[in-house]
């Protein structure tokens, strides 16, 4: 009997898929690296199992890192196993090559990296053929509840639908390699021009991030403190006393980043304002107008990390770990590793159901 191999991105997701499918697909037997039922085999990666590399003839050794050997642009990219997960890769490839497995389902995370993880595994398993040649479908999950998983299996996407995302993922991976290899070798050659070997790594994300840190550090070192003055006062009103602070209503931003509407640079200016208003009557007008404010967009990962850092002091890594746990273990969030701040249109019924559940919970 032919079977379908489902490849998830991590073991916990594979277990969730098995739990969700059991009521409709029957009992699954558990083995060391996979689950199997009458119709399905479910296994998982543990993140990236395969990485790209240049063909061996393009691998310039350290002693030849010079501008004369740049740029390195191989005509193709080969694949190699990630060292620490070789055994896992072998287990997944073994299931993919089974003769009774006639089609594959990519159940890796719903994003560019999830697409790449599966594609590289499938390509590696196919060897020189560049793939196994078996039909592929995509399980696209925004939520990890059992019903959401079953709905996902009822609405599998075709391989052709995912080709654009797969191309984007592969392009990003290969571009990162080209930037990293050529940039690192060029900067290392430049910094080693007077002798020795001074490894200077370059990366698409690493280098701009390092630049931000350096720029900030330079501003901190160049900062010179300046005294400024504020005018604070207590006001007596019919309803009682309240505190207030002077500000310049005509203030406009300038090239001076330290200038603010409530700051004065001269003590005599502050004293003059205080003397002019001390003990003087004044009229205060309070106005309120109705306004309509649109609700904020949903969080993407970056905005969630920024909010959690500002409110709770969480690092980006801590926020991601918490969000991932709420998504995978507690089924309380949609997929967190997203750069989108909107849900797909077909998610409207689920959103309504969630709001009804929250309303009934008394939260």
Where do the model's predicted regions map?
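Flexible glycine-/small-residue-rich
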Residues: 8-9, 44-46, 108, 179, ...
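Extended, highly charged linker/hinge segments and catalytic-adjacent loops that couple domains
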Residues: 162, 166-167, 176-178, 182, ...
């Amino acid at each position: 009997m032919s079977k379908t191999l489902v490849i998830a991105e991590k073991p916990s997701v594979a277990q969730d898929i098995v739990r969700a499918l059991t009521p409709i697909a029957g009992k699954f037997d558990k083995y060391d690296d996979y689950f199997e039922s009458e119709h399905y085999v479910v296994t998982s990666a543990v993140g990236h199992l395969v990485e790209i590399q240049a063909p061996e003839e393009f691998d310039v050794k350290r002693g030849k890192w010079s501008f004369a050997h740049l740029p390195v642009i191989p005509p193709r990219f080969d694949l190699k196993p990630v060292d620490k997960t070789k055994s896992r890769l072998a287990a997944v490839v073994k299931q993919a090559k089974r003769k009774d497995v006639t089609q594959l389902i990519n159940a890796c995370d719903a994003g560019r990296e999830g697409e790449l993880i599966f594609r590289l595994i499938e390509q590696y398993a196919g060897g020189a053929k560049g793939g196994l040649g078996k039909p592929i479908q995509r399980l696209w999950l925004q939520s990890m509840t059992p019903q959401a998983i079953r709905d996902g299996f009822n609405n599998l996407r075709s391989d052709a639908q995912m080709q654009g995302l797969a191309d984007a993922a592969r392009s990003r991976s290969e571009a990162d390699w080209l930037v990293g290899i050529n940039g690192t070798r060029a900067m290392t050659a430049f910094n080693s021009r007077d002798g020795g070997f001074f490894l200077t790594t370059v990366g698409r994300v690493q280098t701009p991030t390092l630049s931000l840190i350096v720029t900030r550090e330079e501003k901190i070192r160049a900062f010179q403190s300046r005294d400024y003055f504020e005018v604070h006062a207590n006001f007596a009103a019919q309803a009682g006393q309240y505190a207030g602070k002077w500000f310049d209503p005509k203030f406009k931003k300038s090239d001076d980043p330290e200038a603010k509407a409530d700051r004065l640079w001269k003590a005599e200016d502050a004293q003059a304002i205080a003397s002019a208003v001390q003990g003087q009557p004044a009229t205060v007008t309070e106005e309120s107008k109705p306004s309509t404010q649109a609700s904020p967009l949903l969080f993407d990962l970056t905005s969630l990390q920024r909010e959690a850092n500002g409110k709770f002091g969480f690092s980006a890594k801590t926020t991601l770990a918490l969000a991932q746990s709420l998504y995978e273990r507690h089924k309380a969030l949609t997929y967190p590793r997203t750069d989108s701040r909107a849900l797909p249109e077909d998610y409207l019924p689920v959103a309504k159901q969630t709001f009804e559940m929250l309303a009934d919970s008394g939260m």
